């Protein structure tokens, strides 16, 4: 029979999703799939790992997404000497007021770009990943919530490079999506060179959604119908990763849940409810 018509909410979701993708596409040209993946992660409330060579536009993609939403954005450049407190914040004694005060680190933003995460020490990496998982920071026994929506876009250069610490498997599991942008195609490269006077594309776009819009759209996505046949297929996919000699560690149940959440977003973005 005919497919049910999408509700007004789903149509709104589809329009908002596409508006975000189109906006970021002005910054990173000709890379619709990785952009859609990033917007999907934002709508799910998951985090993204971009693994790519230097100069492929990882930072531009993150900033393009951040500038498309009227919320806070912070960038942390990871280095071997970066301390956990440089990321999450620190408690200090205010002598004037005679009390302890918490100074927020750059993790307290709606969109956090964690640049070159594999350059940081394992201790600093795990401080970041803990916040990603818990959505809050605990320093000296006091808990501070991060703002919502909250999404970390981490970048890493491929492992062969010197002076990098590989992310452990357990940490990789905290990311909803791992993707790469890759170099632009020939024609796109020529187009980019034609517009050589634009040095920072991310500055040229304006927000299309607010943080509250994102939270509302997330709610819409959780109500998208998932058929049992789809669940069956997702479980079969996940099980297949555990019985393949080319894969050292198969997907966990977390992977199955992530697939389900992403499928809902993908369906809503396609106008299917």
Name each region found by the language model.
Residues 53, 87, 155:
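P-loop (Walker A) phosphate-binding loop of NTP-binding proteins
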Residues 52, 115-116, 127:
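Walker B catalytic acidic pair
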Residues 10-56, 235, 239:
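Pre-Walker A (pre-P-loop) alpha-helix and adjacent loop at the N terminus of AAA/AAA+ ATPase modules
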Residues 94-99, 120, 124, 132-224, ...:
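Canonical AAA+ ATPase core
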Residues 225, 241-273:
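C-terminal helical "lid" subdomain and adjoining coupling/linker elements of P-loop NTPases
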Residues 68-96:
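AAA+/P-loop NTPase substrate/partner-engagement loops
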Residues 36-40, 93-113:
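Conserved alpha-helical scaffold flanking the Walker A/P-loop in AAA+ ATPase domains
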Residues 39-79:
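Walker A/P-loop
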């Amino acid at each position: 029979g005919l497919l049910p018509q999408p509700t007004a909410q789903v149509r709104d979701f589809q329009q908002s999703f596409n508006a975000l993708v189109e906006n970021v596409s002005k910054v990173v040209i000709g890379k619709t799939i990785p952009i859609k993946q990033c917007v999907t992660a934002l709508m799910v409330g998951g985090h993204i790992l971009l693994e790519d060579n230097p100069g492929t536009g990882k930072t531009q993609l993150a900033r393009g997404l951040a500038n498309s939403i009227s919320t806070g954005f912070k960038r942390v450049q990871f280095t071997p000497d970066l301390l956990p407190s440089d990321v999450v914040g620190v408690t200090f004694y205010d002598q004037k007021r005679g009390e302890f005060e918490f100074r927020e680190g750059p993790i307290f933003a709606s969109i956090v770009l964690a640049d070159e995460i594999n350059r940081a020490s394992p201790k600093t990496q795990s401080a970041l990943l803990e916040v990603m998982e818990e959505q809050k920071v605990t320093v000296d026994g006091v808990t501070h919530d991060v703002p919502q929506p909250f999404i970390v876009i981490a970048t890493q250069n491929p492992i062969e490079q010197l002076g990098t610490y590989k992310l452990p498997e357990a940490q990789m599991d905290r990311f909803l999506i791992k993707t790469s942008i890759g170099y632009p195609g020939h024609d796109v490269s020529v187009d980019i060179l034609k517009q050589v006077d634009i040095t920072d594309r991310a500055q040229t776009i304006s927000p299309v959604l607010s943080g509250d819009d994102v939270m509302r759209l997330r709610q819409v996505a959780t109500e998208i119908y998932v058929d049992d046949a789809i669940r069956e297929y997702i479980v079969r996919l996940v099980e297949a990763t555990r019985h393949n000699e080319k894969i050292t560690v198969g997907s966990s149940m977390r992977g199955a849940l992530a697939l389900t959440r992403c499928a809902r977003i993908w369906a809503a973005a396609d106008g299917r409810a």
